[in-house]
Amino acid sequence: MGSMVSAAEQCGIHPYTEGVLTIARHKRNPISSWNPRRVQSYYAQSQSDSRLVNGRKLWKELDGMNNLNIEVFNWFWSNKLFFPLEWCERKNGKPVFVFFWGTILLTGDGKPCVVCMWRENNELRRGYRLLDSMFDANSPAAQYTF
């Protein structure tokens, strides 16, 4: 448990607690029928070449795309076997945190954040990162292609 938890903490991931977070902006997913083959992890242009990008800038770049929201996040959490394993394969020895940009939440002290999932010791974990944090090439967006 140790090294992955440390990596999550180093990446600015906070534990996900349902009662503490409130919805600031929620974009509905216009998915009429679910097809797991259409779910993908997406890296924004600003994340190429392992660059760090501020979460607010990344959010603007991803806005208008088919980003999965907290409803899908909660569905994956309840149905962990359906969460794509390949999304969590380590890149450059670092864990991959998959973010659900379709919903922006607020922490208890009003800071905007986005929820994420990752694998730790073959177990799915969840958390969130503040938008004022930096995101890298190990921080893809969960999206649906039509």
Q: Whereabouts are the PLM-identified features?
A:
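A binding-site-centric feature that preferentially detects glycan-recognition modules on secreted/surface proteins
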Residues: 1-66, 72-146
